[in-house]
Amino acid sequence: MHTKALEGDWIMSFLETHKDSFVHLHLHTQYSLLDGAIRLKDLIKRAQELGVPAIAQTDHGNMFGAIDFYTQCNAAGIKPILGSEIYFTPGSRFEKGALKKQKVVGSQDEQESRHQIHHLILLCKNETGYQNLCKLLSRA
């Protein structure tokens, strides 16, 4: 049997077996500019087909679609988990040169280095968490 078919069969089998307990906690939608492709309507429809109990929306550095996502999930009987994927770096954005480059570990190129930019997924546990995340994103 072809390897890709085995992988696909395994994934579908896993999802079918665990559909009531599997939740995507890192998902970009149309609101992750240049990165997310799925439209909310299509996401909700597919989630209903798979029978997932909840979905997180973690678009890059924004919550532009949070209200629409929350409303559509609730209407479909899916628990919405609001969040965002943020970036953080050492230093302050107000300090010139604060964004330092760091050598890439394991790189063959002695000159290769990358900015120290890290990604972090933040999920809202409740309304207070939502308010805090909104404040954080507004200040960033």
Regions found by a protein language model. Give the residues of each.
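Phosphodiester-processing cores and adjacent nucleic acid-binding clamps
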Residues: H2-A140
